[in-house]
């Protein structure tokens, strides 16, 4: 039987065998008048064909899905189906972009919040001595004396950080919230203080690095967050004095004449450091993509971002319809991460069977690896962490008595009901 089919230009130049295979996969079960049913076995020859076609290769004329009803003729979608499938794909990619690249937007808003208070370069440090409820931080502790700043290695070149002795745990994270280095007790200075030399992605390592703890960051923008503690009387004065006396950041090129430091009290300021949970999330993310080196993200992640219009060197200008779709994707993502963060589905994160307390580091890894990496990355645990918490360091995961720190989280009472701020719990 001779079959006439509408062939797209994409088929030109294909061999007869290849063309036949493509047609077999694409054709619907009703390709010849719409009267025959799906073939029942892989050895059957459907009407209109000359060769057996397995059932699983056939496309029905109409398919009902959660994304809508898709209609096909000879395996080719009609205009409504094509548009719906493309819109659904963009929604999926926007949803995945929100979850997967959330760490970048989170740390970017930390940087922006600091900048709004005058912490605009490495010579300015925000002291939170201590922190009250005015500044919006995800996991700021009110009994910790923080020293916090951002530095840009593209502007400074190799940067020296002088850490004073006696500080608690400190951490450097890159612009994708990845771990770069620990300082203080869990770091190589072991709480005795020392000089750290941070190299950027474009920097060559100096010939002489004697006297420095050397680390390299894959990003230009980096966050230095340091912790000190209240004294026995609950006062921050001693910690503040230690910061002001010993904390220094300066380019290696200025080591012989370091610039003066400015310390800004930010513990009571009114400002925000939390990423948006609406369309503006993508604008925050675009700031990172435009500023940072191309290799901050691997090609797979860059492709995910560019599929919704976020590409280095190009303006992010979604249409009104695209903007609406991106907004919806964020809202669906927020619903998921709120649900799993408050009541994680992974039983392994709970400290005790049948209890509510859990760790934010699923898998016992600051990289959220499953079985040491055999199972890849625990995406739920990673998403939960960066939506609700900040600072990424192995010192918050590994059992380092007297040096690191461990965190437990609870969001529900003994019955599994969410905690209510208007109630008292024992």
Residue map of PLM features:
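Hydrophobic alpha-helical segments
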Residues: 17-18, 91
